[in-house]
Structures are given as structure tokens and as C-alpha cells.
């Protein structure tokens, strides 16, 4: 799957057994052996209240905070805007295979590919995360 692809799953079946629910899914990178590195963007704000939250990277290493912020209404693909402020957190990056995704039996909507500059900024932000697995940083 193309890096930067933005998908919407209804529902997304979580690896940890949490209750399935609709979720966005961004493909961040692909490995040679068919593994995708991806994030599950969320509208949940876990950035400390005293931190300045603006579009783009929010890194507060001393507090273990790493997030990338998309503002509501900003066009992220050629045809799509997130309806709410949306966050990608470094600690929530995980790996998946196409088999994992197909096994969910979910309705999957392809919303396009992130604009190249947004994908580059997102990856640069995540590479700064102290709470992301080192192998994931190498994949980015």
C-alpha cells in the first residue's frame, strides 16, 4: 500500500482486543517483507493542557509527549479534510500486514494519499518520539 495512504475503517478491530470502532489509518512506511508501519489518528487530545498545541509537531520529550496535529478543515489529501482536530501519537504507531487488515472484515474507505509535505512532516515528528520502538524509527 502506498506510503501516506489514509484509510477509514468501520469498524477497526484493535490488536489488543479493545471494542472495535470506526478509525482512521495512515500508512507511514512499508518494509520489504510486506509489513506496514501505520498510525491510528484520533480526535482525543492527550497533550498537556499547558502545552501550546498548533498544527504540526508537538514534542515535549521531558514529559514523554510526541504528537502530530492536523487542524479540523485542513485539506490532508487532494479530496479529504479531517472534520475535527486530529492527533497522531508516537506511542500509538504499530505494524500491520495486509492480511491483518483484510481479516477484520471491515468496510474500508480509501480517502486518498497525504500531501507529500504533510507526510514528510509527520514522519519527521515521529522520528523525534522517545516512546516509539527504535525499529519503527529506522523504518520511517
Q: Where does each model-flagged region fall?
A:
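Conserved functional hotspots at enzyme active or ligand-binding sites that engage polyanionic ligands
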Residues: 1-140
